[in-house]
């Protein structure tokens, strides 16, 4: 499929991360599946590596979005500046190479922590569904190995 200029540029940013890890392009990568509703101006890719965290990368003419587990729009950027492009690239590298811990309090509060190879926390994201309060629920914890190891 042919994609718009914006989508192609977003793919290039992701591919830079993959190439730095000596891996193939995201479009040729065995661990990513293209969603059936993808078209010229919209591309949705799902991670399908067995026993790994589920996440989606959504590329469109307005920017990028990343959903992790049940948390939607964990990252939502327009990529309209070099600073946003750099942040996106760094986030993708963390997503691809980190151990990930998901701590859920009900279905309305999710804490996602990313750990490097030394098991040091490098990033934490909190997802709270609007108009909800669920800290009274017992927390569930899941941990996932990195999609790719970085050396």
Placement of each model-derived feature along the sequence:
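Intrinsically disordered, low-complexity regulatory segments enriched in Ser/Thr/Pro
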Residues: 1, 44-86, 125-151
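A cross-family detector of function-defining hotspots
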Residues: 33-45, 51, 108-122
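Negatively charged, low-complexity tracts enriched in Asp/Glu with abundant Ser/Thr
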Residues: 1-40, 121-151
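Short linear motifs in intrinsically disordered
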Residues: 31-36, 53-58, 99-105
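Generic hydrophobic, helix-prone segments enriched in Leu/Val/Ile
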Residues: 14, 57, 91-92
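Amphipathic protein-protein interaction modules
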Residues: 78-129
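Short, solvent-exposed secondary-structure boundary motifs
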Residues: 23, 42-50, 91-93
């Amino acid at each position: 499929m042919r994609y718009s200029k914006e989508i192609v540029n977003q793919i290039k940013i992701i591919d830079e991360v993959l190439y730095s890890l000596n891996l193939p392009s995201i479009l040729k990568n065995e661990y990513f599946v293209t969603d059936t509703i993808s078209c010229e101006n919209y591309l949705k890719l799902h991670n399908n590596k067995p026993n790994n965290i589920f996440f989606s990368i959504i590329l469109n003419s307005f920017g990028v979005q990343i959903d992790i587990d049940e948390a939607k729009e964990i990252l939502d950027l327009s990529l309209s500046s070099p600073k946003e492009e750099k942040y996106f690239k760094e986030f993708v590298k963390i997503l691809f190479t980190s151990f990930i811990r998901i701590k859920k309090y009900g279905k309305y509060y999710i804490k996602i922590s990313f750990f490097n190879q030394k098991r040091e926390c490098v990033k934490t994201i909190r997802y709270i569904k609007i108009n909800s309060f669920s800290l009274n629920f017992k927390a569930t914890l899941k941990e996932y190995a990195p999609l790719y190891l970085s050396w």
